[in-house]
């Protein structure tokens, strides 16, 4: 097919498509009805119109436009039609009784003057099948039209040119006085559609249902033999008219309607209401045996005839055949009483007789099974070319499969993202534990595996102390002791250990969830940090806390005080990383002495193979406390009294860095003493194998928090500057002012079940959830909310700084212009050359010019020389003021220059 015949998208956007867009029609097919109405005048006198298969509604728009006002217009389609003024639409299938009932409900006692049908089925690659389906749909629409059309009405339908076209025309000709086929100009030439306009409906009182049945109207009769389909004693002269041949075909179809069913299902009784065939007034029909043997359709003959006779000598000779049994002869005598098995026996007898007389030849199975295959020799180039083609096809098929697989995987991933079905990245999707086949996590197995690997290769790096002692033997002894301790653990301890492992797993999952929330929403982290520590944010702002800060922070602040959430997170990080910093570790602590020492910091010792494991001994806290007491007793000796308080030495580096320079100068002497003390203590530790463990402060006395020092003053200052910011605060303040409550009552109400909440030992994810929902609900009043909203509206009504500055500059320029105009007016009034009237006019003009300001110069209007303005001379139509005619390229350049000029201009 040529390039101009391809039905591409852009090729179908013809002038009627553009006209439909301009005139507001929903489809370009609306112009088909416009052209048909212009030729046949179908709509001007119609008072009731039915449009079958009306979506999207283009023909309904044309009918509403050209029909008289107040007419009844009804549209039916399988798809919903958007509402149109003065048009009734509903969704139904025109082949169902439901559509017929709905039409009756809408029309009441009306009869339609016009029935339109522009529908088509969903077409595919089989043209013959699609054409038959279209013609079947046309016949169904005609069936509806015969029920609702008034006498003298019109019917317009779309038909595809096919072999059933003449049958349709014959049916139309029986029901309408005038039938014309036409093709409007708006119909594409590449389309096989034509429109049949049927006028002057006859409106018969009774129509045979078979007359509108597609099985009978479109039945193929070309293959039927003449001896069966036509009587032998009558001959119908062929006519040139297609309608006459179609009428004869329909008559023959009506006569032989049940012939095949009489043979294949003879036991089923039927009531024949079709009457006698034309020219056939007898009920008993006979045929010769030769017609049965030599005929093309023996089944049709058996169904129509009553008896088969052996008339001539040839037929009587078949009676002597071994295949002609008495049962066969008896069956031929009366065909109407035979069953299905008897008809099969007659068909087998026919095949046998045809083989005897030579009409049929028995096929040789051996010859059919063996086929001679002729292989033509191929030269080398053809073989190479064929192999290359096969390889290329295989490669293309493989690439196509891979691309399809990748697209399917991408679609699945996209669907998972849309449904929030993602899983943490650190989880293995092929892990059997996730499928429930084994336990989720077992710390004991991991620890045992670590010990098996670490006995030989885990302690590859051995640390020597100052005396040259090898610590590997001591670490091995400690590992043996730990193994013995693990063996004696009972089931309760194992259960507790697994429970702790599960809690740690949940904490890890919660941490990954928090990280994903931070990545998705930037504001989420700010909100969470504000909820955790409001006082810290008020003074220092929200900032990320590193692992070092979290591990070094050991202020011992209670969780119930302000900032308790951060303390929990820091303790969690410290216990996760620094549980091994006890005296069991055999590595010597490395003390780094900076240039400017402010205090002595005892760093954590290096982690051993045991301390880096997954499990933590349950006896470790007791051992740590016991060794801490031993170390305290050791350092109570008189030798260490000059060193000072060891607990005070373990401070925070960050707090010391924030001290003033004056304090640094005063502490220089003390730093030197601290350094000496550190050296002496480390020496003693190396000699006696003791580790200095800082003692935690006692929890007996009350702690002093610097953050609580001026909190009341800070809150007062915020209220003075910004006022009450929440509806709860406004409600409480209003109640206090109106003496509905007192300060003592408010203080008493602050002590409730939600205020005393013990947070020790609770996981972070639980505490985060409790911080949102486990808090007192203070009732608020409508007046408080209205007051806050009124204040917010007042703030929103104020202009932004940029707008206010622009207005101020504009006002200053206007004042300057007015002052300048006043000075000029004074000069004019002092002039003696002009009269009083002239002076007044000059002053009035200057003041008006100053008040008005400078007028912006009108820009030239750019007119593109295309369409109606192409090649025009003089001023284009509809253009006022200054103009400039340019082409499309120059218009883009002008816009680019404006854009560059605007971007380059500096804002004052």
From Swiss-Prot:
GO terms for biological process: maturation of 5.8S rRNA from tricistronic rRNA transcript (SSU-rRNA, 5.8S rRNA, LSU-rRNA); maturation of LSU-rRNA from tricistronic rRNA transcript (SSU-rRNA, 5.8S rRNA, LSU-rRNA); rRNA methylation. Gene3D superfamilies: Vaccinia Virus protein VP39 (3.40.50.150). GO terms for molecular function: rRNA (guanine) methyltransferase activity; rRNA (guanosine-2'-O-)-methyltransferase activity; rRNA (uridine-2'-O-)-methyltransferase activity. The keyword Cell membrane does not apply. It is found in: Nucleus, Nucleolus. GO terms for cellular component: nucleolus; preribosome, large subunit precursor. SUPFAM superfamilies: S-adenosyl-L-methionine-dependent methyltransferases. Residues 464-493, 546-564, 579-591, 650-678, 685-712 have a biased composition (Acidic residues). Its main location: nucleus. The active site is at 158 (proton acceptor). Residues 535-545, 592-610, 816-827 have a biased composition (Basic and acidic residues). Component of the nucleolar and nucleoplasmic pre-60S ribosomal particle. Belongs to the class I-like SAM-binding methyltransferase superfamily. RNA methyltransferase RlmE family. SPB1 subfamily. Required for proper assembly of pre-ribosomal particles during the biogenesis of the 60S ribosomal subunit. This is AdoMet-dependent rRNA methyltransferase SPB1. It comes from Cryptococcus neoformans var. neoformans serotype D (strain JEC21 / ATCC MYA-565).
């Amino acid at each position: 097919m040529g390039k101009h015949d391809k039905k591409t998208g852009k090729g179908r956007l013809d002038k009627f498509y553009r006209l439909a867009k301009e005139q507001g029609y929903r489809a370009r097919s609306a112009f088909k009805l416009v052209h048909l109405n212009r030729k046949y005048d179908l709509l001007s006198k119609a008072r009731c119109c039915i449009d079958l298969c009306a979506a999207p509604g283009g023909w309904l728009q044309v009918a509403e436009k050209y029909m008289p006002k107040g007419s009844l217009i009804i549209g039916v389609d399988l798809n919903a039609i958007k509402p149109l003024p003065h048009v009734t639409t509903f969704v139904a299938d025109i082949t169902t009784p439901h559509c017929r009932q709905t039409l009756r409900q809408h029309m009441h006692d009306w009869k339609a003057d016009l029935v339109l049908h522009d529908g088509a089925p969903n077409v595919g690659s089989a043209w013959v099948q699609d054409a038959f389906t279209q013609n079947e749909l046309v016949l169904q629409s005609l069936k509806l039209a015969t029920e609702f059309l008034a006498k003298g009405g019109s019917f317009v339908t779309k038909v595809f040119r096919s072999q059933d076209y003449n049958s349709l025309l014959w049916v139309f000709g029986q029901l309408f006085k005038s039938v014309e086929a036409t093709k409007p100009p708006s119909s594409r030439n590449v389309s096989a559609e034509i429109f049949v306009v049927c006028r002057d409906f006859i409106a018969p009182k009774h129509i045979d249902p078979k007359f509108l049945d597609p099985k009978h109207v479109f039945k193929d009769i070309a293959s039927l033999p003449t001896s069966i389909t036509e009587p032998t004693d009558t001959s119908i002269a062929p006519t040139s008219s297609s309608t006459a041949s179609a009428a004869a075909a329909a008559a023959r179809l009506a006569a032989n309607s049940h012939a095949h069913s009489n043979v294949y299902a003879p036991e089923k009784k039927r009531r024949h209401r079709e009457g006698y065939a034309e020219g056939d007034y007898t009920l008993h029909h006979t045929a010769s045996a030769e017609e049965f043997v030599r005929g093309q359709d023996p089944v049709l003959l058996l169904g129509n005839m009553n008896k088969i006779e052996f008339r001539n000598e040839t037929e009587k000779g078949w009676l002597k055949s071994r295949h002609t049994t008495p049962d066969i002869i008896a069956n031929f005598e009366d065909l109407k009483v035979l069953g299905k098995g008897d008809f099969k026996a007659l068909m087998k007898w026919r095949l046998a007789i045809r083989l005897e007389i030579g009409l049929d030849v028995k096929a040789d199975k051996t010859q059919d099974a063996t086929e001679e295959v002729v292989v033509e020799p191929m030269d080398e180039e053809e073989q190479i070319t064929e192999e290359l083609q096969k390889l290329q096809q295989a490669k293309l098929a493989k690439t196509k499969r891979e691309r399809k697989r990748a697209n399917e995987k991408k679609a699945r991933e996209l669907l998972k993202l849309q449904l929030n079905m993602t899983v943490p990245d650190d989880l293995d999707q092929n892990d059997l534990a996730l499928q429930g086949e084994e336990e989720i996590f077992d710390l004991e197995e991991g620890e045992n595996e670590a010990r098996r690997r670490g006995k030989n290769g885990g302690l590859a790096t051995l640390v020597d102390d100052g005396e040259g002692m090898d610590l590997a033997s001591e670490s091995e002894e400690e590992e043996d002791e730990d193994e013995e301790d693990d063996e004696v653990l009972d089931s309760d301890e194992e259960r507790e250990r697994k429970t702790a492992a599960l809690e740690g797993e949940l904490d890890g999952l919660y941490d990954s969830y928090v990280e994903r929330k931070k990545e998705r929403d930037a504001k989420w982290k700010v909100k969470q940090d504000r909820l955790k520590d409001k006082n810290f944010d008020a003074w220092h702002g929200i900032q990320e806390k590193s692992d070092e800060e979290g591990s070094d922070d050991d202020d011992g602040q209670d969780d119930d005080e302000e900032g308790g959430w951060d303390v929990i997170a820091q303790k969690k990080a410290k216990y996760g990383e620094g549980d091994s910093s006890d005296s069991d570790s055999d590595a010597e602590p490395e003390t780094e002495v900076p240039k400017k020492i402010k205090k002595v910091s005892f760093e954590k010792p290096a982690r051993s193979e045991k301390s880096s494991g997954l499990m933590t001994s349950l006896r470790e806290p007791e051992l740590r406390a016991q060794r801490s007491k031993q170390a305290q007793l050791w350092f109570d000796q008189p030798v260490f009294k000059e060193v000072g308080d060891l607990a005070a030495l373990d401070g925070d580096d960050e707090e010391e860095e924030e001290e003033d320079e004056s304090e640094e100068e005063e502490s220089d002497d003390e730093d030197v003493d601290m350094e000496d003390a550190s050296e002496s203590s480390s020496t003693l530790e190396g000699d006696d194998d003791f580790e200095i463990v800082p003692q935690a402060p006692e929890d007996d006395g009350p702690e002093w928090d610097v953050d609580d020092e001026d909190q009341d003053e800070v809150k007062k200052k915020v209220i003075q500057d910004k006022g009450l910011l929440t509806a709860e605060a406004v409600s409480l303040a209003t109640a206090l002012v109106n003496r509905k409550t007192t300060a003592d009552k408010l203080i008493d109400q602050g002590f409730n079940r939600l205020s005393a909440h013990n947070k020790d030992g609770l996981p972070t994810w639980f505490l985060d959830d409790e911080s949102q929902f486990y808090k007192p609900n203070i009732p608020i009043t409508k007046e408080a909310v209205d007051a806050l909203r009124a204040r917010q509206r007042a703030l929103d009504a104020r202009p932004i700084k940029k707008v206010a500055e622009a207005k101020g500059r504009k006002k200053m320029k206007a004042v300057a212009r007015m002052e300048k105009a006043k000075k000029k007016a004074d000069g004019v009034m002092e002039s003696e050359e002009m009269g009083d009237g002239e002076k007044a006019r000059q002053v009035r003009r200057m003041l008006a010019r100053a008040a008005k300001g400078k007028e912006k110069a009108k820009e030239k209007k750019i007119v593109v020389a295309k369409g109606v303005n192409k090649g025009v001379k003089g001023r284009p139509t509809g253009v006022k003021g200054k103009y400039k005619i340019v082409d499309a390229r120059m218009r883009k350049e002008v816009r680019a220059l404006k854009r560059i000029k605007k971007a380059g201009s500096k804002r004052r």
